[in-house]
Amino acid sequence: MICSLVLVSSAGSIRAAEMPASKEYLNSIGMKLVRIEPGSFQMGQLETLGPNVLPVFRGRGLFDSLKNGDYDEKLIHTVKINNPFYMSEFEVTNFQYELFRPEHRALRGRNGFSSKDDEAVVFVNWYDATAFCRWLSDKDRLEYRLPTEAEWEYACRAATTTNFHTGDVLTQPFLKKITVGGLGINPADLTVGQTPANAWGLYDMHGNVEEWCYDWYGPYVKGIQADPVGYARSDFRVTRGGSVGSDMYYLRSANRLGAIPETRNWITGFRVVLGELPKSRPLKQPLRRYQQNVVTRSREQVTKGPDPDKPYFMGPLRYVNIRQGSVGPTYSSHNHCPAIVECPNGDLLTVWYTCHDEHGRELAQAASRLRPGRKQWEEASLFFWTPDRNNHSPALWYDDDNEKLYHFAAVSIARNRGKSVLAMRTSRDSGATWSPPRLIVPEFDGGRLPSEPVIRTNDGTIVVGVDGRHKGTELWASHDEGLTWYNPGAEIMGVHGGVVQISDGRLFVMTRNAAIDGKMPISLSSDGGKSFTSIASDFPPIGGGQRLALLKLRTGELFFASFTSEGGDGIFITDATGNRREIKGLFAALSLDDGRTWPYRRLVTDDGPARTIECTDGGCITMSARRSEYRGYLSVCQSLDGLIHLISSRNHYSFNRRWLMTKPPAPVDKPVRVRPIVETFDGPEKFDSPGWHEYKGPVGHFNGSGQYTIESGSHYNGINHIVRAGSFEATYELKNIHYNPSGSRPTEGVTVGFRDPLSTGHPTIFVFIKENALDSRTGVKVALSSPPKSATMKFVYNEKVPQWRIFYGLDGAEPTTELGQPFKVKNPTSEAIAAYVLMSNGSVDLDRFEIKPVH
């Protein structure tokens, strides 16, 4: 072993000691480092993953769609490491770090993590880690630093090509620190060196704590890379290795993670390398679709719009445009929780979350633009994603005073959204580029999910509402243009709060998941949010899958949009003929007196004949003068031309104040009755019956054998079709039912049935195929190792009773076996009822579907 020496030249200057050359090196603070020799390796996920490695899908089976790894690992490429370096055999410990910063001792044991000397240090951000490296470099006169991402994976693999340096799976004692579906929040022992070292003598490369790397995060590039150092700039620094409390999937050698550099938490630490930083040129980030061709337009161009004195309505226009079967960086499965803003150049910018599972680590934020004069939203592109962190709830705001766009986002510590921080960034070029994200609420805690609108109060304070820690809404405010933030103190009843300031200076908030006397609450504060008084509105409360929108218009009125209760009663309006009638679904309202009364109310529809549209994730709904979307998260903005732009979880509507204040016409048609449907699934390119819609983005295709194949790698992927009101018999014929290897875990499997969200008191009628029977219990999970090869199901609905009877036959049998007793329901179905065929983690061939009206 070569000792660290300080050599003094004849001129009296001090130069660094020479690099060691032995296999191991013990430095001045007792840290042992092992020598990593030059070489090359294949970087990225190399093997197909087995079911024992895949992450769990919220108790519903596994993510089979991730069997080839995350999308950011799939560009496998050769990396050459041309120079030797030393890497610490363990992660930096509390004892070692506190030689540099003794005050860190106060953080030991916080949240139940890392209290002992020999546990990995946590609650250190990227800047803390690099500062430690500089301190140690000055102390030893040697160059210590963080490893590059390529060096880290090269050293972790230690010449292996398997999922882990142990092989295709992790073995004991690694499994002691793995939590299936884990959140990374349960206290754990972080003592270093408790698991076996890899072939090169490095410990804890799979689990214990995540480790900061030198690189800015970015996409892999093609071709051979020599000593890569990542990107010149990004929003995130790379972390590697995974942590305690994680699924095995996130501990793989190839798995990439990242974090905002200022992040401090209980699952992230670091290890050091000794050696000169490679002199490779960092890469430049490619422009994403939403960043391209962003032009400047004059205010005169932007303010031109429809005649404000004539009613104007447009929609629905789909803004979620993602290709079928997409598994990253955008996902076709689940798209929800949007935000919308008009950019200074007149572009409309939408941002929403995109994922398989809203609790998953893959959940990212996507974006799309609608350029002035265009009739179609652009293809979605990745907008914001902290790698392998759930990035929930975007909020957008344009600050007219400072001509600046704001973007707020919740960033989880891992999966789920229960422990999050609140990040903010800004743009001065219509969202083409953004400032580095900054943690404005930096402590990981419950809630932190921002909602809209973001407002500036009369005294200049910026206010944003977030879901609080106790199932309520908190306000966070800034008096210094977003530099520092504080919570005024009160927690408001209900979540997803919309906040405005009314003319007398009070804050006015409306929320979800709360009710007063069976109505949505209004909460009012006259002290800047320190306390609130709540009263009942005259609108119905809303629940899961629904979010209201609230906005103070440029002309001073309050705009409100929400939904009638799913499966409940509607609200009443008076149309242009003087007829008072019930409407159900998405509606908008206008108040001229700060929310005391809402004299103008309209169903958000074009008032035309009944037609099928898609709502959240592609679920079918009948839009008419009586019905509109039944659920979704809403966001609203008003553009400079006066138009109000309202979006749900899938669609964009625009209308003006005059339309909202004009009484709707009488319906042009009567509720549509059920019609015959015969679908053979012969293809080869189109369905026999128009009106089938994808639900949650399956991979579906006509297979050339007279069938339509649905392939699913996640949960509830399939197709649906509007049936409409009336008595009918429905027959489903399914063949070649196949479950992916993870089908041995409980999952919904094949799900068939009907859903009518706009019929009061009418439940969803779904059945699930088990090995030798059907099951109709809500949310049933079946563990199928050998599903039936085929199934035929007949649903008989009688609207006069009203009731359902369900018959089935498996493996070629006729559908003569009745499933339990008839299902009696409260009310008849509506024109919005839809038939569903869904698959979770597997594939099924649809052979025939038929609807016969019964008179």
Predicted regions and their residues:
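Boundary at the C-terminal end of the N-terminal hydrophobic targeting segment
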Residues: 14-16
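A short glycine-rich, aromatic-capped structural motif
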Residues: 25-107, 127, 207
